[in-house]
Amino acid sequence: VQGDIFPLEKGVIMRAIWKRELQAYFLTPTGYVFMGVFLLLSSVMFYLQIMQARSSDLPTFVGQMSYLWMLLSPVLTMRLLAEERQRRTDQLLLTSPVSLSGMVLGKYAAAYTVMAATVVLTLGFVAVVAVYGRVYPAEMAVAYLGFILQGGAFLALDLFISGCAKNQVTAAVFAFGANFVLW
């Protein structure tokens, strides 16, 4: 029988990596800066595209908000693996009982959690439009699903680049370039 002898223990370790990375996002300014800048820019876009134009075309707005993923996802991922290599703590992680894929998935899950929390905060825009206009729930669900999946794709690409880069700045620059090419 092939497979892991202790799969549950590895899941616990992966969860510990997720928790550690999530704490790192909010014990340092990174998570707050990402969320704040994303919400500031999306609020400006909301004001200009929806409020000022007196429009209720939220799916188009959500689609255009996707540009922010391209610009800001490198902020979330630049430190995930490049910092481990720079601080030389990557060897400690690589010799831990968790697999390489478990380590990467734990880090990805933490970045995805921060991104998902940011997306939840943008639902306030939908509430504002619902008060003054008409919102089609199925249309919004599909728009937000695409928005979240696109953000996840950018995070995955940027995490890969962070794993290839020697430092955080290089990871961010190449991730931004790759996002631009992917877009």
Describe each region flagged by the PLM.
Residues 9-31:
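Aromatic- and glycine-rich beta-strand/loop motifs that create alpha-glucan
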Residues 18, 36-39, 73, 108, ...:
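Residue-level signature of the transmembrane alpha-helical core
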Residues 20, 24, 83, 95, ...:
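Transmembrane helix-loop junction
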Residues 29-49, 64-74, 177-181:
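Hydrophobic alpha-helical transmembrane segments of multi-pass membrane transport/permease proteins
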Residues 45-47, 58, 110-170:
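Secretory targeting signals
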Residues 61-83, 118:
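Long, hydrophobic alpha-helical segments
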Residues 80-110:
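Helix-loop-helix units of permease transmembrane domains in multi-pass membrane transporters
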